[in-house]
Amino acid sequence: MITTTGLTKVYQSRDREVTALDGVDLHVREGEVYGVIGQSGAGKSSLIRCVNLLERPTSGTVTVAGQDLTALAGRGRRASAELRRARTRIGMVFQHFNLLGSRTVLDNVELPLEILGVSGRDRTRKAGELLDLVGLADKAKAYPGQLSGGQKQRVGIARALAGDPQVLLSDEATSALDPETTRSILQLLRDLNQQLGLTVLLITHEMDVVKTVCDSAALMRRGRIVESGTVAELLATPGSELAHELFPVGGTASGPDRTVVDVTFQGESASRPVISQLSRTYNIDISILGAAMDTVGGRQIGRMRIELPGRFEENVVPIGFLREQGLQAEVVEDETGPQAATVVPEQTPAALTKEVVK
């Protein structure tokens, strides 16, 4: 549904150039919720603004629903008629709600329909339906100043849906909201994704957003995508930075002759007593150094850091036992020396891409 190829954006800043995007290749499948995460300055907002050409890419292509938007951009600063028509299929929600304070909630949602030339009766009906969809039918005659932050963002979402888009872009839409309101907005985005078949591309710096709502995710750093894949693939990939951030676990070896292993549980394996089985089967004492578990996409997923007695060479069989139970097991690098070994799955998911940034 959304594909960027070799996307580059360079800004001119006085006497120097600033590269915000450096050859970004991104593919968002139809009907999925895709999260792009990274620290401030990573290039996330530049990326999402290039997707609908609010920012003109310096080079590369952007394709949405099979149409190359960069080919429609034209040469002037004003968007071509073809690009404006293509943009009606792309809705966008911003961090700051950008509502007109002098207009009612209903009038704010009607605004894009006015611009599209929809008749008064039809746009009022459409705006009312959208407010009902986002749970604000009773606020149609209210003004933005009378709404909470979460309600304002719901109005922004309703407005973004006015043109019946196929794609919804969300630029840090929950970063100014409290945790409870954030959860309600994320649930709304997921509901809209499922009810309307929307493809959602969201930008965030919060790992909880990815964990709560995303099917796939990408990590950006210095204008490049350094890791991407479905959330399930990322969690199943030893050494994944995103997996580590989604489910952080800590703890170091208590002595030199100890082996520390990160174990990832997914699905049925998350509810089985595998660690106690390991202890009984091999008659070894296992220390749990840290653990994190949550539900992602309706599946229970977790990571646990355990310590086994003895060096790695003495624990090859117990670690193999963990793999036989359908778990991912990775030996953690010794902080005092190079990593002894890493136990990896027999086959890395083909759809997962990972790039080392030099």
Curated annotation (Swiss-Prot):
GO molecular-function terms, A-Z: ABC-type D-methionine transporter activity; ATP binding; ATP hydrolysis activity
Keyword Iron-sulfur tagged: no
Pfam families assigned to the protein according to its UniProt record, in alphabetical order: ABC_tran (PF00005), NIL (PF09383)
Main EC class the enzyme belongs to: translocase
SMART domains: AAA (SM00382), NIL (SM00930)
Chief site of localization: membrane
EC number: 7.4.2.11
GO CC, any one term: plasma membrane
Signal peptide location: none
InterPro entries documented for this protein: AAA+_ATPase, ABC_transporter-like_ATP-bd, ABC_transporter-like_CS, ACT-like_dom_sf, MetN_ABC, MetN_ABC_transporter-like, NIL_domain, P-loop_NTPase
Topology class, membrane: Peripheral membrane protein
SUPFAM superfamilies: ACT-like (SSF55021), P-loop containing nucleoside triphosphate hydrolases (SSF52540)
Residue sites binding ATP per the record: 38-45
CDD domains according to UniProt: ABC_MetN_methionine_transporter (cd03258)
Subcellular location: Cell membrane
Family to which the UniProt record says this protein belongs: Belongs to the ABC transporter superfamily. Methionine importer (TC 3.A.1.24) family.
Subunit details: The complex is composed of two ATP-binding proteins (MetN), two transmembrane proteins (MetI) and a solute-binding protein (MetQ).
Biological role: Part of the ABC transporter complex MetNIQ involved in methionine import. Responsible for energy coupling to the transport system.
The name this protein goes by in its record: Methionine import ATP-binding protein MetN
Gene source species: Streptomyces griseus
